[in-house]
């Protein structure tokens, strides 16, 4: 079952916890304050493979890591990180500042 979170980002990340490429992306996001986004562990899918099915619908394969943004699937950890560097870092800094102000 998908849990609702307060979103700061308009993407979803599909991963497996034992996948080194997934961990590379997850660690990069955490280290750069890219947090509060929907992420789905496709191995811990108590909803009857719903996450795997949605991943397949997005990109035509069940491969992780996969970031789905604007309805398009992006695979490969290096590509995801490069996209994040280009598109997310400034917003991540702004979001972090907002969170710190609200404390």
Model-inferred region functions:
Residues 20-21, 50, 75:
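Short alpha-helical
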Residues 63-73:
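A short, hydrophobic beta-strand/beta-hairpin element that forms part of a small beta-sheet core
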Residues 76-90:
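Short, compact, well-ordered microdomains
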Residues 1-39:
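Local sequence-structure signature of Cys/Sec-based thiol-disulfide redox active-site neighborhoods
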Residues 96-103:
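Short acidic DE-rich linear segments
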Residues 56-63:
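Thiol/disulfide oxidoreductase modules built on the thioredoxin-like
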Residues 46-53:
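Structural motif
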Residues 40-45:
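Short glycine/proline-centered loop/turn elements that form peptide/ligand docking sites
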């Amino acid at each position: 079952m998908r849990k609702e979170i307060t979103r700061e980002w308009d993407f979803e990340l599909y991963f497996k916890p034992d996948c080194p490429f997934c961990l590379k992306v997850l660690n990069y996001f955490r280290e750069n304050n890219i947090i509060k986004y929907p992420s789905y562990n496709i191995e811990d899918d108590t909803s009857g493979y719903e996450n795997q099915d949605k991943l397949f619908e997005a990109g035509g394969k069940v491969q992780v890591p996969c970031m789905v943004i604007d309805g398009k699937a992006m695979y490969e950890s290096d590509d995801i990180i490069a996209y994040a560097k280009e598109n997310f870092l400034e917003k991540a800094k702004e979001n972090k500042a907002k969170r710190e102000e609200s404390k």
